[in-house]
């Protein structure tokens, strides 16, 4: 009969140990991915036009001969995680997968800027101070580590601000892909304001698809001050907590998850004012996550819960349907509709 420790079988204990070690060393997942992007490996393989051999790869990378084995080990681990495919014929070679295709710079859909922004020590390094942050009454995690709120930090650090805007723009391109089958969102509209629209990545796609639709990108003055619009696209600087330009619809893409419930109510009330001006009854369209642990696949739930912890560090949150509903009612909206998008996002339309 197998022995037990504290009532646990050795097999249970070793399984638990494996789980612990997986999470203890999970930072290597992120850092090896950052290494591949920093070494431009996805582009090297893409430009090669076919699977690239280890010898060709290290020749292009110009690494010392003593590190060739380390390159192979990193590539093997990245392949195990789904970022490359190992082809074994005469010599071990590497091909892109769908995941690493999303890291090819210059492609229509490239998330390399997201990797660089999130895994910069400015952001990722802050998580070493979770214990200190949890005892602070009002400070965000970044307030603890950076000495100011995240948005204030961006204003004072133009280099990282550029990295952040590039990351958001790269993510917007994938959201735009999800919106391709959502023409109904824009049907019947004459105008829409993209609140927190950054450099206008999403707005430009909307304008191209609906050339008669007037689109306003509304963001902080320092974000939009040097940007040029077009016939149906304009940039307006301002503060969404003070006022939002009037339009038939307001778009909030990845905005509300950054803020507390109290701040979200302030934003939503300003949105309501913007879409009900002059007796009109427009709508507010939200693109964000809706947590549903009962119905979502485990991997989707994990992404949403990861993002929820990430947003908590900004004093924001990801929300389930009941939490969204409570916000909408308190902000004075009458009804809402949730449409799942491809991936882990949902499209929420709310009506005054």
From Swiss-Prot:
Functional pathway: Phytoalexin biosynthesis; medicarpin biosynthesis
Keyword Transferase: yes
Superkingdom of the organism of origin: Eukaryota
Active site location: 257 (proton acceptor)
Gene Ontology biological process terms in this record: methylation
Catalytic activity: a 7-hydroxyisoflavone + S-adenosyl-L-methionine = a 7-methoxyisoflavone + S-adenosyl-L-homocysteine + H(+)
Summary of the function given for this chain in its UniProt record: Transfers a methyl group to 7-hydroxyls of the isoflavones daidzein, genistein and 6,7,4'-trihydroxyisoflavone. Can also methylate (+)6a-hydroxymaackiain with lower efficiency.
Quaternary state and interactors: Homodimer.
Matches recorded under PANTHER family: O-METHYLTRANSFERASE
UniProt name for this protein: Isoflavone-7-O-methyltransferase 9
Organism the protein comes from: Medicago sativa (Alfalfa)
Lineage of source species: Eukaryota, Viridiplantae, Streptophyta, Embryophyta, Tracheophyta
């Amino acid at each position: 009969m197998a022995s037990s420790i504290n009532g646990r079988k050795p097999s249970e204990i070793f399984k638990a140990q494996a789980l612990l070690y997986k999470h203890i060393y999970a930072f290597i997942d992120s850092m090896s991915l950052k290494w591949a992007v920093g070494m431009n490996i996805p582009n090297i393989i893409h430009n090669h036009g076919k699977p690239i051999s280890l010898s060709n790869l290290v020749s292009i990378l110009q690494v010392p001969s003593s590190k060739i084995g380390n390159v192979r080990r990193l590539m093997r681990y990245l392949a195990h995680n789904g970022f490359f495919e190992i082809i074994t014929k005469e010599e071990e070679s590497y091909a892109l997968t769908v995941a690493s295709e999303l890291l090819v710079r210059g492609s229509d859909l490239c998330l390399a800027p997201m990797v660089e922004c999130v895994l910069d020590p400015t952001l990722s390094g802050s998580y070493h101070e979770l214990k200190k942050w949890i005892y602070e009454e009002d400070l965000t995690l970044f307030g603890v580590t950076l000495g100011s709120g995240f948005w204030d930090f961006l204003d004072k650090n133009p280099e990282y601000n550029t990295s952040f805007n590039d990351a958001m723009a790269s993510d917007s391109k994938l959201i735009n892909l999800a919106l391709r089958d959502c023409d109904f969102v824009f049907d019947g509209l004459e105008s829409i304001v993209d609140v927190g629209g950054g450099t206008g990545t999403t707005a430009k796609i909307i304008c191209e698809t609906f050339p008669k639709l007037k689109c306003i990108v509304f963001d902080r003055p320092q974000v939009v001050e040097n940007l040029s619009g077009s016939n149906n696209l304009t940039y307006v600087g301002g503060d969404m907590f003070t006022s939002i330009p009037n339009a038939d619809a307001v778009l909030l893409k990845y905005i509300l998850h950054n803020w507390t419930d109290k701040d979200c109510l302030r934003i939503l009330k300003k949105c309501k004012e913007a879409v009900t001006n002059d007796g009109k009854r427009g709508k507010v369209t939200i693109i964000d996550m809706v947590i549903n642990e009962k119905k979502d696949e485990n991997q989707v739930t994990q992404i949403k819960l990861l993002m929820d912890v990430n947003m908590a560090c900004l004093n924001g949150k990801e929300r389930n349907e009941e939490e969204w509903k409570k916000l909408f009612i308190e902000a004075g909206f009458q009804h809402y509709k949730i449409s799942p998008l491809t991936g882990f996002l949902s499209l929420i339309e709310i009506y005054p």
